[in-house]
């Protein structure tokens, strides 16, 4: 049972395309869902510092995976960014 319709649409597309749950796209997708869930949780519970730390860790993992994908395959990276509606990280 999926609570969020956005999650179900993207996960169905991922399942139709490939069964590989270890792919970079699927990992970024699952991290994005965790980030959105933790963000809404932290909106209610502002002093939950362990969840804040967990959110920062997941954000870092997603950032590293996106950097890897942008180096390896820029087309798949752009498509994933557009599909998940997340911003590109700032370049230094």
Curated annotation (Swiss-Prot):
<comment type="subunit">
    <text>Part of the 30S ribosomal subunit.</text>
</comment>
<keyword id="KW-0689">Ribosomal protein</keyword>
<dbReference type="InterPro" id="IPR009068">
    <property type="entry name" value="uS15_NS1_RNA-bd_sf"/>
</dbReference>
<protein>
    <recommendedName>
        <fullName>Small ribosomal subunit protein uS15c</fullName>
    </recommendedName>
</protein>
<dbReference type="GO" id="GO:0003735">
    <property type="term" value="F:structural constituent of ribosome"/>
</dbReference>
<keyword id="KW-0687">Ribonucleoprotein</keyword>
<dbReference type="Pfam" id="PF00312">
    <property type="entry name" value="Ribosomal_S15"/>
</dbReference>
<dbReference type="GO" id="GO:0006412">
    <property type="term" value="P:translation"/>
</dbReference>
<keyword id="KW-0934">Plastid</keyword>
<comment type="similarity">
    <text>Belongs to the universal ribosomal protein uS15 family.</text>
</comment>
<keyword id="KW-0150">Chloroplast</keyword>
<dbReference type="InterPro" id="IPR000589">
    <property type="entry name" value="Ribosomal_uS15"/>
</dbReference>
<dbReference type="GO" id="GO:1990904">
    <property type="term" value="C:ribonucleoprotein complex"/>
</dbReference>
<dbReference type="GO" id="GO:0005840">
    <property type="term" value="C:ribosome"/>
</dbReference>
<dbReference type="GO" id="GO:0009507">
    <property type="term" value="C:chloroplast"/>
</dbReference>
<dbReference type="InterPro" id="IPR005290">
    <property type="entry name" value="Ribosomal_uS15_bac-type"/>
</dbReference>
